[in-house]
């Protein structure tokens, strides 16, 4: 009797099919329209397949997580499969269409294969590296002696369009490892040979995908055929070393992107244009906010007066809030002896990210990469009782980390930066309330600076990988339950990510969503079971015994530099009135109005406004234009009528001419906007 399997659909419906039925056939049994719309399937089964295979991939091979991409998936975990995959066991099945985000990633993976197919047809001497999907599209690494030119990229894109129309099916096959090695060795595909040899074992079957004459070592899945790839573009070319090692040959990395429709593709590039306009590196120079000076070194920020003013506002607000919320402000040294970093573990586990030691008075010192050990030393400077806890230390501390030159990016990734670090030392009973307070503080930071949307992730441990975590099971369970309870008390939806916690404790990451819908990781609340043990922290409990305090790290800006970079891009440099480095530009119509303009300047500055007066002997429109380009919130114009009436003619950023107002009335309105930290003008 033919074996039957049960397929459970997302709505709970259970259907029975012969073993070997494909997801596409399941879709056809439901509706021909669904079968045509389906792109890929998600299945979950607790029964392993009859044969064990090792799936290929297009990942680099530098880390364990990358290596895992080459191994067979856990048969009990949800996984994506081709619509042509035979179903041999009972499964839960979801058919994904173009509306599902996971389907887009599959499309882009297939587009990477399409691009590699085109490259080999046009440039047969090329050797293949790997080609994954990314959040923004896809790329593929190639090795060839001759560099690709801009004209080549156009040719490749054109050939991709031709291949897409051929409607070649993406076909998966499993072949013996030795047969696959022989096939790729025959073509001198040294990178594919490396992947197979490193991530598969002798005697195993390996997974290949073919479309037309193209073949790749790959785990998939893919769209059914090339004609599903309709809207794509080859975007740019970059260099990448084979296996990320500068001693290896340099590869040429072609980037592209793909969508299910031309409309989505066009919207994507319109969004990229808007992102380019908001680039904080461009606006930082245009608005004279900051610079990076080559003679001083990469990743080191020079804050110009206007940028420094915003930084001061950010730091002053943060310090005032910390004091209001019960934190004690502290300052710790920029350099400390290596012995401290050995005790903390940084010297052994983090030294590659630290600047090299300097020798002073027969002792080695290092620039601090983190503020935590300094705060711990202050805590240890006197005996502590349970009555003293919680102790909350806050510092806007400068830290220094060695970042590779290729990883730095404007303000977003630098070598020297300022962290709004705080460390809370408390009893186990106080944990939940302290975490609630940290979350409340984080929400206040984001909303005050105009970020009304954010996402929260809770990173927990993998209890099956116990040896890789510091702290007892009881401590981990208490910390995780406290974080969960705190988020529940605040009514915040969150996503739990098992196995993503640092070795020293679970954490909450708060990712803000900017005006373009981009996610930015900034605020973190992090438990630490490692440092209290390393530094032998103690307090005397109510029972008279010595106990180890719970230690919580929290950073809300993350770093002042990164937060400022995100602010620039979020507002496109048009900062809200309370945050703008210059709030008001003053334009006297002619030289005879300068005296009145100076009087207005004095009154505004006395009221606390940041003002710039254009004294140049230029035409009024030129002055207005210059202030507008600098994105000042207000431009006030003064002529005969304004001088006689004690008024100003108001131009508001983004709204234009607002007419004449008595100066006192303008001051009152603007003061209210500043006091409420309003984003309106």
Swiss-Prot record:
PROSITE patterns annotated for this entry?
A: AA_TRNA_LIGASE_II (PS50862), TGS (PS51880)
Any one Pfam family here would be tRNA-synt_2b
Give the EC number(s) listed in the UniProt record.
Answer: 6.1.1.3
Q: Which SMART domains did the record assign?
A: tRNA_SAD
Q: Which InterPro entries match?
A: aa-tRNA-synt_IIb (IPR002314), aa-tRNA-synth_II (IPR006195), aa-tRNA-synth_II/BPL/LPL (IPR045864), Anticodon-bd (IPR004154), Anticodon-bd_dom_sf (IPR036621), Beta-grasp_dom_sf (IPR012675), TGS (IPR004095), TGS-like (IPR012676)
Provide the protein name: Threonine--tRNA ligase
List each copy of the TGS domain by range. 3-97
State the reactions this protein catalyses. tRNA(Thr) + L-threonine + ATP = L-threonyl-tRNA(Thr) + AMP + diphosphate + H(+)
Taxonomic lineage from the root: Bacteria, Pseudomonadati, Acidobacteriota, Terriglobia, Terriglobales
